Amino acid sequence: MGEPKIPTRPEALELLHRFNESDSLRKHAYAVEGVMRHMARKRGQDEEKWGIIGLIHDLDYEKFPSQHCVKTKELLEEHAWPAEYVRAAISHGWGICSNAEPQTDLEKALYAIDELTGLVVTTALIRPSKSVLDVQVKSVKNKWKDKRFAAGVNRSVIEKGATMLGVTLDELIDDTIKGMQEVAEAIGLKGNPA
């Protein structure tokens, strides 16, 4: 195992790709990374750290779905990731598959936006453009009310996360959209050519 070593993005990306072959899971990871980087910049935090943790937060989901978060902890520890990174990565599953309650702003942000990225993706995909570039807060809020729309998205987790962060739901949605717009091409939501 060795001494903890701060991972680089290329190392994190290689690990993500080794354990996740699914295009949709990889795109979700890129989306969460993009939002985490956006939020880190906005808050004057370490963008690289926030982004890397966003990138690998679902590391175990494809190969070990019944051990989600538990296996991520093991895998990251095997690769000598710092305990702070490991805890942050598994905190997004608090109350579902992890006992690590989000404490830091990084952890609270990851907890809040993980599910929200799914709602933004689904909102973008029903638009004629199929682009996140023209998704607005009001579009997501309109879909938010319809519990059948993106029914798998746990809206109560998103609301709880916004409260933990001390932001309004509108602000959280806006930050999520902006972060995803920054990585629109990587997540396949740049849209159809006009």
Identify the residue ranges that each predicted region occupies.
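Acidic/His-rich, divalent-metal-binding segments that scaffold phosphate/diphosphate chemistry
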Residues: 1-64
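Residue-identity detector for glycine
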Residues: 2, 34, 44, 51-54, ...
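Conserved active-site and cofactor/substrate-binding residues in soluble primary-metabolism enzymes
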Residues: 7, 11, 27-31, 67, ...
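Predominant activation on well-ordered alpha-helical scaffold segments within soluble catalytic domains
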Residues: 13, 17, 30-37, 70-73, ...
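Active-site oxyanion-binding pockets that recognize sulfate/phosphate
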Residues: 18-22, 103-106, 166
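C-terminal binding/interaction regions
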Residues: 20, 132, 138-194
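Divalent metal-dependent catalytic cores for phosphoryl transfer on phosphate-bearing substrates
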Residues: 43-149, 159
